Amino acid sequence: MSVISMKQLLEAGVHFGHQTRRWNPKMKRYIFTERNGIYIIDLQKTVKKVEEAYNFTKNLAAEGGKILFVGTKKQAQDSVKEEAVRSGMYYVNQRWLGGTLTNFETIQKRIKRLKDIEKMQENGTFEVLPKKEVVQLKKELERLEKFLGGIKDMKDLPDALFIIDPRKERIAVAEARKLNIPIIGIVDTNCDPDEIDVVIPANDDAIRAVKLLTSKMADAILEAKQGEEEAEAAEETAPETETTTA
């Protein structure tokens, strides 16, 4: 059984690309036709590429790999957060801070600051500080949480990125490529597929399309984790083999 059906893709509007004047010729192989000035994506190819992305993600997660979900455009923000949280992975859904990957040590210092302020809030320090200082700390905490909340538990560089709209997230793409971190991406007709390791040709502007495809990547991670749990349970319940001596 395939990971995703043509019906699901059609209903979510995955096949609608960009206007023909806003296209990248490298996406030609994923285009089925043109209709009313808009490119229509070949969903047969999308089905196959979703399957490829699903298996890649599942295998990576099965080996303990960590995946960073990235989508800062309005249509992607909610799905990216929800599906990353659901699958126990990390996310960036606001602004990508330059150096998130390539200057990871500096980002870790900002995350430490975020956690320090959280501790101050939890252990009662806020109650003994001047009101003005507390207001400033709360503002700082809110800002740090907004931009770093989705990666505050990410202790090492991720093993892969899942990106919605590589054109919009070009800084994230450039950083990942510099560090040889593989990228899975939802790639519309105006993007460059050569920058992405596992291309999912799809509409990256429709909320339903983004939600559907992002949820499939989360499903792949959860399937891998479930497989691990079942294997561990089987090991625990397996009867010990007795050895007999002649």
Curated annotation (Swiss-Prot):
Renumbered residue ranges of the record's region Disordered: 224-246
PROSITE patterns: RIBOSOMAL_S2_1, RIBOSOMAL_S2_2
Keyword line: Ribonucleoprotein, Ribosomal protein
Keyword Signal: no
Family, similarity comment: Belongs to the universal ribosomal protein uS2 family.
Protein name: Small ribosomal subunit protein uS2
UniProt keyword Ribosomal protein, yes or no: yes
Taxon lineage: Bacteria, Bacillati, Bacillota, Bacilli, Bacillales
Organism: Bacillus velezensis (strain DSM 23117 / BGSC 10A6 / LMG 26770 / FZB42)
Originating gene: rpsB
Biased composition (Acidic residues): 229-239
GO molecular function, one term: structural constituent of ribosome
NCBIfam families membership: rpsB_bact
Gene Ontology biological process terms in this record: translation
Record GO cellular component, one term: cytosolic small ribosomal subunit
CDD domains: RPS2 (cd01425)
